[in-house]
Amino acid sequence: MSKLASRLVMLRRIFDKFGIPIFRKPKPVVAVLRFSGVIGQVGNPIRQGIYADGFIKPIEQAFNLKNLVCVAVQINSPGGSPVQSSLIFKRIRSLAEEKDVPVIAFAEDAAASGGYLLACAADEIFADESSIIGSIGVVSSGFGFVELLEKLGIERRVYTAGKSKAMLDPFKEEKVEDVARLKELQEDVHDTFKTIVKSRRGDRIVVSDEEVYTGAFWTGRRANEMGLIDGIGELTKTMQEKYGEKVVFKPVGEKKSWLKQRLSASRLMGFGQKHWLNQVIPVIEEKILWNRLGL
């Protein structure tokens, strides 16, 4: 053994004796990204929704951690904006392929609709037996105030250039041609959704398209049987089984400070009162999305 090698061995023994990990193999790191709530800027004013601008930076931080072996994605969402879902999905896939890092998703209460699309960004998907999974479809909802205006004696005046500019105006009677046009748009979005699911899940889905792509949703147990997910499991145990007991979990993403939460809440109070309707309707819409899943 050369003098240099002997000195290195001696130096290593000294560092080991004093617990200095300079020569030890670094512990594997799992970055943890959490997506919770409605997708898009439509959620509860106090608890903001999931949108690309707010998550691109944390996603990039996750893939740049040292000693990274995997990015774990926790999902608890009933869905929301297909565009925001797609933007986040694409960024995760782009970095996963660039960095050659596996992504594993874990569904909590729900990974439905856009929430399931986010899960499809992962190479593997796990869920609880009772998680709600699926809802691979498109829904549009709104309100009609025609009779309300009549009762209040209010006349609405709308001036447009272009016959479809005021399509589906909630203060006007619904038109058959407007609904037909909306359905065309929904079919386009649905086709995109189906293409993504098929490209990511492939032959793992063992049931027919007629069963999967109806907008229906299932429990985690049934979704596992269908091939919509890869197994029943939760983050900590699954990651330890894959990467060892000494795996280090590093949550990525900014948590709102107490002051920021108070400032968000002020939208419903004080200087936000004149816009109360714009604030209340998103809360109702968020509740409706969760209620569709029985949650």
Language model regions located:
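Short glycine/proline-centered loop/turn elements that form peptide/ligand docking sites
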Residues: 132
